[in-house]
């Protein structure tokens, strides 16, 4: 499908995961406006990279393993106003990290990672790769962030609430710490089903992460005012 935002267009026909609310919220929420360099892990169609380009003056490096998705991503970059600040790397993040040098540390890392750790794989192989952590485990993701993140940098992720216990267990044994969480609630009155996370290099002593909530929709089905404020620079309707 094709999606037109206020300042760019996305064609995600050959991508494992279609454009969805999770990525839009993450791209609008991440605190990356002051970043000079951004790394998008698992770029897919390039949505997060393009949102980062619109919101900052950063140079964005986008790493995507799947060749078909990488081709779609490159097409979307080429047709955007920020093609000169967007670099696509068709590679696994593990291979990319092996080549990184000190000068290439990133001020901000953004990622909407695969989220099913087990169970029936999606039938379509591209969709399976995009959705299941077999292609990028939490351990591999945290290792990559540790290697690529600048000393004072932050990483922004979105995860299912049901994955947080496992994620926090792995995080506790990493060199990173959780400094901020925002619980994402789909509709007024429901429990949070997604969590927006900010990670940084571990410091001592560690402090409890800041916590907040965002509710996406009113009971009427309309977006909440908080959500409208978050996405108004991107959605044509607003």
UniProtKB/Swiss-Prot annotation:
It catalyses: adenosine(37) in tRNA1(Val) + S-adenosyl-L-methionine = N(6)-methyladenosine(37) in tRNA1(Val) + S-adenosyl-L-homocysteine + H(+). Keywords: Cytoplasm, Methyltransferase, S-adenosyl-L-methionine, Transferase, tRNA processing. GO terms for cellular component: cytoplasm. CDD domains: AdoMet_MTases. Pfam families: MTS. Its EC number is 2.1.1.223. It is found in: Cytoplasm. GO terms for molecular function: nucleic acid binding; rRNA (adenine-N6,N6-)-dimethyltransferase activity; tRNA (adenine-N6)-methyltransferase activity. It comes from the Bacteria. InterPro entries: DNA_methylase_N6_adenine_CS (IPR002052), rRNA_Ade_Mease_Trfase_CS (IPR020596), SAM-dependent_MTases_sf (IPR029063), Small_mtfrase_dom (IPR007848), tRNA_Adenine-N(6)_MTase (IPR050210), tRNA_adenine-N6_MeTrfase (IPR022882). One of its GO terms (biological process) is tRNA processing. Belongs to the methyltransferase superfamily. tRNA (adenine-N(6)-)-methyltransferase family. Specifically methylates the adenine in position 37 of tRNA(1)(Val) (anticodon cmo5UAC). This is tRNA1(Val) (adenine(37)-N6)-methyltransferase. It comes from Shewanella baltica (strain OS185).
């Amino acid at each position: 499908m094709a999606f037109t935002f206020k300042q760019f267009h996305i064609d995600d026909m050959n991508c494992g995961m279609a454009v969805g609310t999770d990525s839009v919220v993450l791209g609008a929420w991440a605190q990356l406006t002051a970043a000079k360099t951004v790394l998008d892990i698992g770029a897919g169609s390039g949505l997060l990279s393009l949102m980062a380009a619109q919101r900052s003056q950063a140079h964005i490096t986008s790493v995507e393993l799947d060749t078909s998705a990488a081709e779609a991503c490159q097409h979307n970059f080429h047709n955007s106003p920020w093609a000169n600040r967007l670099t696509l790397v068709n590679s696994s993040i593990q291979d990319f990290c092996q080549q990184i040098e000190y000068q290439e540390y990133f001020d901000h890392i953004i990622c909407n990672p695969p989220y099913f750790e087990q169970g029936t794989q999606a039938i379509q192989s591209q969709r399976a790769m995009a959705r299941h952590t077999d292609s990028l485990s939490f351990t591999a993701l945290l290792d990559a962030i540790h290697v690529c993140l600048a000393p004072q940098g932050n990483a922004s992720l979105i995860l299912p609430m049901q994955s947080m216990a496992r994620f926090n267990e792995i995080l506790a044994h990493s060199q990173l710490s959780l400094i901020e969480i925002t619980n994402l609630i789909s509709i007024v009155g429901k429990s949070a089903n997604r969590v927006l996370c900010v990670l940084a290099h571990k410091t001592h002593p560690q402090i409890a992460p800041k916590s907040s909530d965002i509710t996406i929709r009113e009971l009427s089905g309309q977006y909440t005012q908080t959500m409208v404020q978050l996405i108004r620079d991107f959605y044509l309707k607003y």
